[in-house]
Amino acid sequence: MIEPFGNQYIVARPVYSTNAFEENHKKTGRHHKTFLDHLKVCCSCSPQKAKRIVLSLFPIASWLPAYRLKEWLLSDIVSGISTGIVAVLQGLAFALLVDIPPVYGLYASFFPAIIYLFFGTSRHISVGPFPILSMMVGLAVSGAVSKAVPDRNATTLGLPNNSNNSSLLDDERVRVAAAASVTVLSGIIQLAFGILRIGFVVIYLSESLISGFTTAAAVHVLVSQLKFIFQLTVPSHTDPVSIFKVLYSVFSQIEKTNIADLVTALIVLLVVSIVKEINQRFKDKLPVPIPIEFIMTVIAAGVSYGCDFKNRFKVAVVGDMNPGFQPPITPDVETFQNTVGDCFGIAMVAFAVAFSVASVYSLKYDYPLDGNQELIALGLGNIVCGVFRGFAGSTALSRSAVQESTGGKTQIAGLIGAIIVLIVVLAIGFLLAPLQKSVLAALALGNLKGMLMQFAEIGRLWRKDKYDCLIWIMTFIFTIVLGLGLGLAASVAFQLLTIVFRTQFPKCSTLANIGRTNIYKNKKDYYDMYEPEGVKIFRCPSPIYFANIGFFRRKLIDAVGFSPLRILRKRNKALRKIRKLQKQGLLQVTPKGFICTVDTIKDSDEELDNNQIEVLDQPINTTDLPFHIDWNDDLPLNIEVPKISLHSLILDFSAVSFLDVSSVRGLKSILQEFIRIKVDVYIVGTDDDFIEKLNRYEFFDGEVKSSIFFLTIHDAVLHILMKKDYSTSKFNPSQEKDGKIDFTINTNGGLRNRVYEVPVETKF
């Protein structure tokens, strides 16, 4: 029974090796499930399981019956109207990032929101266009269009050439069809990952990586909108360093800038930025955020229409938008083939952003979130959106913040927002016809402030974790230089490389006892340390595998202060000389040491030829000699063999989670080298699976025995102290007891069973 004794930690138990512990404490027979067992569970069915699956697939069936109509409906309506207005404006603005007509941004704002209502698990995120995703789709579309055959038209891309599309230019129709295909494929990838329950892949996108990537992507968005702000004709670039080519194209024709577009964009951007800052600073006092984007859009459209900016200043405007939705199209398989890599990146970034934002709100409001179901919801939304000519989306941070801050309680707010978008598409879209594209570009840039402010993360990460800081910086550089697709792939690879680097060069340490307790810490960190004479405790804080087994060996040699293999070879060479002297009768043994009747001895050429490395690495065998050799004493003829005081080595493997074949072989070689020079090795802190794995690898033999494993460092240290006949008076003479008992150390064959006379209490 465990009972508290003040603030003291008092434990009385035997010193346990792993073998002794398993003998005294029988293990339960656990049944490890096989693949067939898991398959049976997956394929079995019951009414409860069927209900659980339906509720999981359609989360709306869980929360809609519990909807508090009187308490939540008004809040959801107010939130939905605010979110819908923002969704309309962002849809129009982010369509420019894909380089397609703005009306398709409205489609991208409508369909995903409707699908997410039924399949999503978050109650607060607003699903639709997101600037980073729009930029990635635009680059994928540019790549797909550039790979298409020169005479390829919109019809071959799946867009029928009918009267409804006659107002579109051919290149716009081609880009619309390509964007739809990219969106459908991204949705298929997300849906497949959700069905297969492998949403965990997003864990490879760390917070630092996502922050660096979105910051670099925001810079790409900024550069891509310059052509609309200056109203310049800039060709699309999809190859690496494309951002620099775009900048060159912009500044090489800067003299062609449309001043009316530039001035309008700067005014809108300035006003939007100021009001957004006011919204942020006074969010606790404002009942709802000031809808500055909507206000500026109305003003800009009215001024453009009243002053006839299109004809007077030749500004680029949104233009006529046909009311209603266009018929669905069939995705193009060839576009799938040309953009599969880009689509994978789009799918993963979309999920990572949406899931991270949804996680914040789920923790804040305490409701469950299912990552795999989120993948299904986003995937279905993108598939439907692509079929109806929209483009891939996720959740815009600002739009979700509006939905939550204006009182949104459930996805009913998302439904109201979708209805607002629907009204614009069906009835009042024509009012936006005179709106300048430069205004939409300014609105898009106004939403980048939060992402561009992430540059401040560099200093914070540098102070907290330099590896994370390096990941952020390299992700930013890769994404800027290589583009969004290749940059993301290179960033993930670099991040995984840092993980390998951390485990390949772990911070190994030498431990010692603190304050005569059972606590062992790095001996460099504390003053009151005790290290038993001739005992070294070495800790490795990472897995040991093929990449770091060599580093582990080097650090261990540094810790003990000598190479066991070098000592072994020196001793075997010395033993050959001693054995030769003894056979020739030139060596006598006295109580005071060796007496040699010759002054020197030379190896014959034949003997030197036989001194092969393999022979010198074998265990030292002195059974044929009539005397014992003390390798730390003086040897005859001044034979030089390094003297070592180490007799016991403890390896703390409590942080070693796994070994591979190469590391097992290397570890066994290291242990054999120490054992062959009479250094007892003990391994502590491992779990049962670790030892079972060593058994499967046939790790144990006549030299390396299973009895070297102990439960804790303290168990191993006490075992060594008793085994070496250490007197307790050396540690705490005032607390010694006169009574003594016979204590048997049972090492289960690893070491010879010996009987020691030790004190009743063993204290430091």
From Swiss-Prot:
Keywords, ordered alphabetically: Antiport, Cell membrane, Chloride, Disease variant, Glycoprotein, Membrane, Transmembrane, Transmembrane helix, Transport
Tissue occurrence: Expressed in the colon. Expression is significantly decreased in adenomas (polyps) and adenocarcinomas of the colon.
Gene3D superfamilies: STAS domain (3.30.750.24)
Entry GO CC: apical plasma membrane; brush border membrane; membrane; plasma membrane; sperm midpiece
Residue ranges of the TM segments: 77-97, 100-120, 125-145, 176-196, 198-218, 258-278, 343-363, 375-395, 412-432, 470-490
Listed CDD domains: STAS_SulP_like_sulfate_transporter
Membrane topology annotation: Multi-pass membrane protein
Ranges spanned by the short sequence motif PDZ-binding, renumbered to the chain: 761-764
PANTHER family: SULFATE TRANSPORTER
Function comment: Mediates chloride-bicarbonate exchange with a chloride bicarbonate stoichiometry of 2:1 in the intestinal epithelia. Plays a role in the chloride and bicarbonate homeostasis during sperm epididymal maturation and capacitation.
Reported disease: Diarrhea 1, secretory chloride, congenital: A disease characterized by voluminous watery stools containing an excess of chloride. The children with this disease are often premature.
Name under which the protein is recorded: Chloride anion exchanger
Organism placement in taxonomy: Eukaryota, Metazoa, Chordata, Craniata, Vertebrata
